Regions:
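Nucleotide/phosphate-binding catalytic cleft detector across ATP-hydrolyzing
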Residues: 1-150, 163-274, 281-308, 313-325
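A structural feature that tracks compact, well-ordered secondary-structure segments
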Residues: 159-161
């Protein structure tokens, strides 16, 4: 890549907005607080900290949902703010160039909107790359003739792709991801423990289950019937049971991709293993469940949720593989 203008890789996820340039990677909560007139009052970590504490005249908005832009002007404003925050100073973005990760399932209109968000944020030139192809590069398996099966567990979608020679040959997607678990945990706590918990507490319990060695996890909430503050407990076994539908989704997706792939590539996957990435890749017990269910190696990519944006940055130097908007 050249050095005269700023270069950046972008992954506009539903939960996190990720950037990568020649210096480092950044990750911001992809959320904003807007008032009744639609004016931006807070974004990123500041907005997330205000969730559940807002007065009636303010509301929390996520500009990207299930990988698709739901609010183009707001998405552009947040991206512009993130780019300026990452630059370390409020300089203009004139002449900046970017490569943006585009979901494999995106329609031509959705791809156009993603590029438009980048341009409205101040990016001069935008190139795009399929999310699975970027992830393959980030996982270190791009360009190889051997087959690689990557599974992206996002906030609201889970996708599995067979990659060979830097191309996604087969992709399957389900509209359910790690974020679904939070809603299920909230419902489970309410129905089984008469405890009302928020999305943040549910997410904390989900993540703690992956690290906790004990059998029980304390959770703070409100008594469902009286509304008084209450500290309850969820067992690791309960959380794992709530996670099971996601496990089963991933297993079905992997099986569907293997069934639709040439036998030579399937053999490669049985030797190399399935590669998990995305924000939900480290869900408690997921890799172990898949190893048992699929009878093959399963690995969590070290870069996790940053795999695609890291790969997009690596691919950006190979301009011909990217589509110029």
């Amino acid at each position: 890549m050249g050095t005269r203008s700023r270069q950046v890789a972008i992954d506009l996820g539903s939960a996190r907005l990720r950037l990568r340039d020649q210096r480092q990677a950044w990750s911001f909560p992809h959320v904003a607080i807007v008032d009744e007139e639609g004016s931006l009052r807070a974004w990123g970590d500041q907005a997330l900290a205000m969730a559940g504490r807002l007065p009636p005249r303010l509301r929390l908005v996520r500009p990207v949902a299930a990988g698709a832009v739901a609010d183009l002007p707001l998405a552009a404003r947040l991206l512009g703010s993130a780019l300026r925050a990452a630059s370390g100073k409020s300089r203009r973005l004139r002449g900046a160039q970017a490569v943006v990760c585009v979901p494999d399932h995106a329609t031509s209109l959705e791809r156009h909107v993603l590029r438009q968000v980048c341009k409205d944020a101040g990016i001069h030139q935008v190139r795009s790359v399929p999310h699975s192809v970027a992830a393959a590069a980030g996982a270190g398996v791009s360009g190889s003739p051997a087959g690689a099966l990557l599974v992206d567990i996002g906030e609201h979608r889970t996708s599995a792709s067979m990659i060979a020679l830097g191309t996604a040959l087969v992709t399957r997607t389900v509209k359910r991801g790690a974020g679904s678990v939070d809603a299920w945990l909230m419902r489970h706590a309410r129905d089984e423990h008469a405890l009302t918990i928020g999305a943040r507490v549910a997410e904390e319990a989900k993540l703690a289950a992956a690290l906790e060695t004990g059998a029980r996890l304390p959770v703070r909430g409100q008594d469902r019937d009286e509304g008084l503050p209450q500290v309850g407990e969820l067992t690791v076994a309960e959380i794992r049971a709530v996670l099971r539908p996601v496990y089963e989704d991933v297993a079905r997706l992997v099986t569907a991709v293997l069934d639709a792939s040439p036998q030579e590539l399937v053999d490669d996957v049985f030797e190399r293993g399935v590669l998990l990435h995305g924000g939900g890749a480290r869900l408690y017990g997921l890799d172990a469940h898949l190893r048992q269910e699929l009878a093959m190696p399963v690995h969590v990519v070290e870069s996790g949720a940053d795999t695609a944006v890291e790969g997009a940055w690596l691919l950006a130097a190979k301009g011909p593989v990217l589509e110029l908007a």
